[in-house]
Swiss-Prot record:
GO cellular component: extracellular region
Keyword Hydrolase in record: yes
Gene behind the chain: Prss53
Name under which the protein is recorded: Serine protease 53
Source organism phylogeny: Eukaryota, Metazoa, Chordata, Craniata, Vertebrata
Region described as Disordered: 27-46
E.C. no: 3.4.21.-
Residues of the active site: 77, 128, 224, 341, 382, 477
Amino acid sequence: MRQSWRPELLIVGAVVVIEGLQAAQRACGQRGPGPPEPQEGNTLPGEWPWQASVRRQGVHICSGSLVADTWVLTAAHCFEKMATAELSSWSVVLGSLKQEGQSPGAEEVGVAALQLPKAYNHYSQGSDLALLQLTHPTVQTTLCLPQPTYHFPFGASCWATGWDQNTSDVSRTLRNLRLRLISRPTCNCLYNRLHQRLLSNPARPGMLCGGAQPGEQGPCQGDSGGPVMCREPDGHWVQVGIISFTSKCAQEDTPVLLTDMAVHSSWLQAHVHEAAFLVQAPGVVKMSDENSCVACGSLRSAGPQAGALSQWPWDARLKHHGKLACGGALVSEVVVLTAAHCFIGRQTLEEWSVGLGAGPEEWGLKQLILHGAYTHPEGGYDVAFLLLAQPVTLGPGLRPLCLPYADHHLPDGEHGWVLGLTQKAGINYPQTVPVTVLGPMACSRQHAAPGGTGIPILPGMVCTTVVGEPPHCEGLSGAPLVHEIRGTWFLVGLHSFGDTCQSSAKPAVFAALSAYEDWISNLDWQVYFAEEPEPEAETGSCLVNSSQPASC
């Protein structure tokens, strides 16, 4: 695997080595013989003295790293469904450059005990780390670990090792792999651009990622459990992550998922007292990859304020013959969603233009698709799909909203935001209006004429009522109904009928976007669907040895 990135020196600040007991008294993270900087290609003998091959009955299963003279750190998923009595069949080979067999000078040590976090259930859920206690100490150099407050150099180049996948030789050799360290939000953003639900938001709390070099292959099968390492200015190498999983072999746009060492540092310190943990000196400049991938549903500001003029980066303003006719929402670089009723009797594309975000630029339309079942707003299916004539460039001022999947949860009483129109100096401006979701039966009753029955609120509809004092505004057809879940904003509705600005009048009724997942997906234009973000999880631990069951 040829590597093409230029090496970048990683400078993140001064480091103090907090020494533990015996193992940490010698220098951790000191790379072996070789050039001052690692080189892409085959690993040199002794270059990474802490590199471990974790084997079962002599066969390589996973990689690992020596973090104390009797402890090896690896991935928990390497030991799934393992019976306690099988510990004797496992061993660790240190100093070998061959995946099978041993290089000259390599050392093989047995495994006495295995520790797993309590929180570990499956590698995709996080907490994918394990500690192997060796049967006797080794003299190999150990790898440094980070303190919980360690700031990772996101966007910078770090290193991993992987077993060469481009050879048919059974005994694969160890190679150096340069990886770009990627934060969890950016990693999820990259995976969500693949538009595959099974791959959406894979980076859970307690994870980070590593991206391969452009056009090159990163860690692969057999590399699980191996360390991802960053170099400090004083020469210490610190393990920032454990290779956990990836989609096929890691590529630039499908990063490898890593177990975050800083998040799990307290757990490690509680179990490996001899390891050396690094703490960074005050004043370290944080490195960020925040702008390297524009995620759907992300806001750089604090969020909307009631009555404020809209500055949302996904707002769409649909103009017919130059006059504002409807609202809408940007859901990808080329797609805007709005209400179908906006185009009844006026479907000539050249008559329309679309403004986006807060900027003055306008886009033409290349294609217009109305839902085939639409007849009138009260009958449902009031959704239109607009394909822009030219793609937009996403950035701080232009970001798409996330679309909900069919099982997206939007309970009655949920808070959200809609847009109305307010006039200032004779000019219409979109105004943010806080709302709550109203149940279908209550919504139907409020739409009833005096003494009559209400209109049916169909399953593909959602109603809202204004929170607090009704604002001075008018409704805008096709305007988005949005709500936020743990920092991610979703497009949950498009205004169809009713009044978005008046709580005492008929409630606003929206086309519920979760009901249109299949219709939107079948149009075969990529848009940004997203899973609901999960809450943060805590980590714990348990010991697996001769006295406790492997399922602990």
